[in-house]
Amino acid sequence: MIVRVCMGSSCHLKGSYEVVRRFQELQKKYNFKLYGSLCFGNCSQGVCVEIDGRLFSRVTPENAEEILKKVLQNG
C-alpha cells in the first residue's frame, strides 16, 4: 500500500504535518509506504491523502487510522 500526503500550501496550513506524523506512527502497525506529495488539486477539501490511487479529503490525525482500515477492508 502506498500513502501520499499532500504537502501543498493549503494542506500544510490545514495540518498536513500532523497527518504525516500520525501516518508515521501507523506504519508500525500497518505495512505501507509513506510519501509527501505535491498538490492534488482539491485544496478546499484538505488535508488530502491518496492511498493506492484513491483520494481522501479532510484527513486528520484522528481519522487517519479509520481511513486506512477502510482501504484495507475494501481493497
From Swiss-Prot:
Gene3D superfamilies: Glutaredoxin (3.40.30.10)
Temperature dependence: Not very thermostable.
Cofactor: [2Fe-2S] cluster
Pfam families attached to this UniProt entry: 2Fe-2S_thioredx
InterPro entries: Thioredoxin-like_sf
Gene Ontology MF, one: metal ion binding
Note describing how the cofactor binds: Binds 1 [2Fe-2S] cluster.
Binding site for [2Fe-2S] cluster: 6, 11, 39, 43
Classification via CDD domains: TRX_Fd_family (cd02980)
Keywords: 2Fe-2S, Iron, Iron-sulfur, Metal-binding
Role description: Might be part of a multi-protein complex, possibly involved in metal cluster assembly.
Name the UniProt record assigns to this protein: Protein TM_1420
